[in-house]
UniProtKB/Swiss-Prot annotation:
Catalytic activity: RNA(n) + a ribonucleoside 5'-triphosphate = RNA(n+1) + diphosphate
Pfam families per UniProt: RNA_pol_Rpb6
Any one Gene Ontology cellular component term annotated for this protein: DNA-directed RNA polymerase complex
InterPro entries hit by this protein: DNA-dir_RNA_pol_omega (IPR003716), Pol_omega/Rpo6/RPB6 (IPR006110), RPB6/omega-like_sf (IPR036161)
Enzyme Commission code: 2.7.7.6
UniProt protein name: DNA-directed RNA polymerase subunit omega
GO BP terms: DNA-templated transcription
Family: Belongs to the RNA polymerase subunit omega family.
GO molecular-function terms, A-Z: DNA binding; DNA-directed RNA polymerase activity
UniProt function note: Promotes RNA polymerase assembly. Latches the N- and C-terminal regions of the beta' subunit thereby facilitating its interaction with the beta and alpha subunits.
Keywords carried by this UniProt record: DNA-directed RNA polymerase, Nucleotidyltransferase, Transcription, Transferase
Source organism of this protein record: Thermosynechococcus vestitus (strain NIES-2133 / IAM M-273 / BP-1)
Oligomeric and partner information: In cyanobacteria the RNAP catalytic core is composed of 2 alpha, 1 beta, 1 beta', 1 gamma and 1 omega subunit. When a sigma factor is associated with the core the holoenzyme is formed, which can initiate transcription.
Length: 77
């Protein structure tokens, strides 16, 4: 299954707003997104993957919004 690698800025904004709406605390979800992005950036740096088209913060927003929208993704882990 091939994933889409390009997302419009409107879609990223919509997903970020959905995350904020589903969260009880705006600050906490912002920190969670930042921590996920920081963790991703560290993993990418250690693996030396320069060809990834998405920035870590955008990838974190997409992943976290997918987890909220599709909780069955977490059930497999």
């Amino acid at each position: 299954m091939q994933k889409r690698l390009h997302y419009s800025s409107l879609e990223i904004n919509r997903r970020a707003e959905e995350l904020i709406q589903h969260s009880a605390n705006r600050y906490r979800i912002t920190v969670q997104i930042a921590n996920r992005a920081k963790q991703r950036r560290g993993l990418e740096a250690s693996e030396d993957l320069d060809d990834l088209p998405l920035k870590p913060v955008i990838r974190a927003i997409i992943e976290m919004s997918d987890e909220v929208a599709q909780p069955e993704l977490l059930a497999d882990s």
